[in-house]
Amino acid sequence: MAVNSASYSRWCCFADSWQREKLASMESPEEPGASMDENYFVNYTFKDRSHSGRVAQGTMKLCLEEELFADVTISVEGREFQLHRLVLSAQSCFFRSMFTSNLKEAHNRVIVLQDVSESVFQLLVDYIYHGTVKLRAEELQEIYEVSDMYQLTSLFEECSRFLARTVQVGNCLQVMWLADRHSDPELYTAAKHCAKTHLAQLQNTEEFLHLPHHLLTDIISDGVPCSQNPTEAIEAWINFNKEEREAFAESLRTSLKEIGENVHIYLIGKESSRTHSLAVSLHCAEDDSISVSGQNSLCHQITAACKHGGDLYVVGGSIPRRMWKCNNATVDWEWCAPLPRDRLRHTLVSVPGKDAIYSLGGKTLQDTLSNAVIYYRVGDNVWTETTQLEVAVSGAAGANLNGIIYLLGGEENDLDFFTKPSRLIQCFDTETDKCHVKPYVLPFAGHMHAAVHKDLVFIVAEGDSLVCYNPLLDSFTRLCLPEAWSSAPSLWKIASRNGSIYVFRDRYKKGDANTYKLDPATSAVTVTRGIKVLLTNLQFVLA
């Protein structure tokens, strides 16, 4: 077919022009009208989001696990660590200053460290290279000191928080001393609070008797509860080294500030509209008034509770053997070591002289009465089994008087192995770990509650009056309460505080007083004011 030469020439010119425009547009993608789809493969930046993490992980693996490219050897207690100046300097200002200074360590191939143990330095290496470290209670204070010295700030702060959460009677003075040396105000405050609220337990310990003067002054000037006998503690500290410390006597007595305790009594119970338990803390004033100073929610099915050294301990929940402590310094709930076995309706009793909590009797999950006795060493966070009770009981009242636990009433087995209300008094001596049953019985039986005042045990039971039990004379004295209470039987609870006996009603009608205060010296009964607790089922009252 013949092609028109003029048409062919025009078509070639058009094609040539279109090709030149296309090439020009590809060379100049910034010009208006350029297509993003056409420029996608011409100008594209790829960013690997996992690159930095992969490089860091790979580098640490090469450096630590395969021990490649090590350029410094750190010797600690004879063990040599093959490490890297760059990694150490990146994480620690201490090592950065060491390696960039004119000191001999900047050029030596082997560096010996004298102020750290081998096991703790291994933990520091793990932290520096991997960012993780397993903190153990037995090494925590050394890790705290060394991390501050080597300027590992994040690790130091975490150790400080850990120590503040775990400070207790057994280590509070040591932790306070430690925090003072390292200028750590948060940890110092937590340790000081523990020390001043447990001063009576600490005053004869080696740590207290060797306490520096400025730390003792800071403790007693911060407000010590009257119940901790701060004057006796001051005298004990002075008499330990009277020749040198007599000069501080007047200044210490002037600095002393005694206060009432913020939390005198804990009520544990339930509201009618709730299924879980509540712990309500009460402040008892000298004008016969009681005010609510706090409230904490607890788990379901609290089976036992006690107050030890100002802290609240409760056992129970979905797993009956679990135990928690409400730290009075931080108002946080902390897990404690669980009981060896699940137990229900057992009795928890605080024994401050041994810094221990005893669990006595109770029921197994198979509803069998138990005569087991175990005790929890607060300082060691460990439960230990000891001598059993003479008679298996559950739901008994417990009171500690001079190291002897009086277990009162509850339920015991009858001759047919059915349970019956008990009138027994069992005495467990925490010094000898021996138990015996009194040859006489209580004037009433069943579930009751008890509190110690001086050398007496005050007992209340369902639908009965208040009874004063004198273990030395083996006698009981019945004390009558107002007729309005006696006419409406209910399960009462009792607490001893500030030289007075407080009696709480479990249920009360609208308008009735729910708390009475008894003066044991005069037998005078007064109605307390200012409290309206909505708990309809008082499980425990702890003072």
Swiss-Prot record:
Keyword entries, A-Z: Kelch repeat, Repeat
A Pfam family that the UniProt record links to this protein: BACK
InterPro entries for this protein: BACK, BTB-kelch_protein, BTB/POZ_dom, KBTBD4, KBTBD4_BACK, KBTBD4_BTB_POZ, Kelch-typ_b-propeller, Kelch_2
Ranges of the Kelch repeats in the UniProt entry: 264-310, 311-353, 356-403, 405-455, 457-505
Top-level lineage group: Eukaryota
Occurrences of domain BTB (ranges): 70-137
SUPFAM superfamilies given in the database record: Kelch motif, POZ domain
Residue ranges annotated for the BACK domain, each copy included: 172-264
General function of this protein: Substrate-specific adapter of a BCR (BTB-CUL3-RBX1) E3 ubiquitin ligase complex which targets CoREST corepressor complex components RCOR1, KDM1A/LSD1 and HDAC2 for proteasomal degradation. RCOR1 is likely to be the primary target while degradation of KDM1A and HDAC2 is likely due to their association with RCOR1. Also targets RCOR3, MIER2 and MIER3 for proteasomal degradation as well as associated proteins ZNF217 and RREB1. Degradation is dependent on the presence of an ELM2 domain in the target proteins.
Quaternary organization: Component of the BCR(KBTBD4) E3 ubiquitin ligase complex, at least composed of CUL3, KBTBD4 and RBX1.
Protein name in the entry: Kelch repeat and BTB domain-containing protein 4
UniProt organism field: Macaca fascicularis (Crab-eating macaque)
